[in-house]
From Swiss-Prot:
It is found in: Nucleus. InterPro entries: DREAM_LIN52 (IPR018737). GO terms for biological process: embryo development ending in birth or egg hatching; negative regulation of signal transduction; negative regulation of vulval development; regulation of DNA-templated transcription; regulation of neurogenesis. Component of the DRM complex, at least composed of lin-9, lin-35, lin-37, lin-52, lin-53, lin-54- dpl-1 and efl-1. Interacts with zft-11; the interaction is required to suppress the activation of non-neuronal genes in neurons. This is Protein lin-52.
Amino acid sequence: MSRPLGFIGYEFGDDEMFVQQMIEKKSNAEQAKMLEQQKKMLECTETMPEESEPVPMKCLDFEEAFQSESVSKGYESPYKNISFLKEDAVTVNTMSHCPADDIAKLIRNIQNSVYTLGIEEARQCRRGKLLNVLKPTGSASPRYLQPTPPKNVAEETTGSQ
């Protein structure tokens, strides 16, 4: 039994069902309107000119331009290309089966080793500098780089009186 729009009956709880039906009708209408808007947005309005060549031929020409050997013959890479040794291939194959956590741990260990070696090298350089080991023996250093002996303060104070 259909009720007129806006009728809310109070007998036997019909008002809740009527309100629910009105909400469903309203949401269905909104969904239909939304679908129409989406269809219009997806509609293609582009037209292809008939006098130009078809798109696939243009794509093939583009691909052929990059596949030609003329580009690679004249190009020289600024990077060194070092071929893999057998040990390198074995290492790569071994590492490909390792989980990511193990690889991250290995990289951290390598970074720690490099850091430790850097600290040790810096310590050795400072030590060599202090001992004047790093200077070439044949050349004399300029006067401003030569160490000056400390002045005797006691002689200066007694000499001025």
